[in-house]
Amino acid sequence: MAGHSKWANIKRQKERVDAKKGKTFAQLSRAIIVAAKHGIPDPAGNFQLRTAIEKAKAAGIPNDNIERAIAKGAGTYENDDTVYEEIRYEGYGVGGVAILIEAFTDNRNRTAADLRSAFNKNGGNLGETGCVSWMFEQKGVVRIEGNIDENALLEASMEGEADSYELYEEDDDQAAEVFTEMTNLDTLSQTLNDKNFNVTEVELRWIPNNLIYIENDEQAKSIIKLIEALESLDDVQNVTTNFEMADELMLLTVES
């Protein structure tokens, strides 16, 4: 889990100074639309919707926009017949790095063409469904921040039936990610909240079963460039890979 978590944390730091706020708003709004469409349009009884709303609020999306997205998903918003669907795409980057892409789109052909172009321009290949998904397992992840007592975290994790956790230091602040089975995510999140941990993010995440270690500078630059190209597409919600590289190489690549 460490490799993917490292990249996720670096992305999180980049997003704090990312100028593409409009794209972030669009992504989060689409996540709300799809969550409301797949379940009841009430966050109290729809965990996926509640999580999407929490992320949207954390990003500063106005309540009016959130309510409008819920209405679109529920089919009660007037003058809007746009239908979004959730699709997973799969492919490879340089060095055989496996890549999973989760997208929300109203046009499959457009999304596939955009993804194929991004792969081709950055040394990768868009593959068939199932070509890499077997290399990953979907887990629930709860992120906490603030002063963290590891003994208290261990006790809470066991009570919430977590599988494992990882501690981090970010900008002189403590953080941790706690992993669990998909079906236990709501329970774990509530347990950590009840134990007075500062829960800042709750999500489902694809975790690689095995990692590919990248040591070559050019390969590292190529895979990061491909990931950023994929993430820049409006229809793309999440990109997950199975690479690992040294901290120094990853930071150098991200900053270049």
Swiss-Prot record:
Q: Which GO terms describe its molecular function?
A: DNA binding
Q: Where in the cell is it found?
A: Cytoplasm
Any one Gene Ontology biological process term?
A: regulation of DNA-templated transcription
Keyword set for this entry?
Cytoplasm, DNA-binding, Transcription, Transcription regulation
Database matches in Gene3D superfamilies: 1.10.10.200, 3.30.70.980
For this record, the Gene Ontology CC terms, alphabetical, are: cytosol
UniProt xrefs under HAMAP family? Transcrip_reg_TACO1
| Family to which this protein belongs | Belongs to the TACO1 family.
> What is this protein's record name?
Probable transcriptional regulatory protein cce_0894
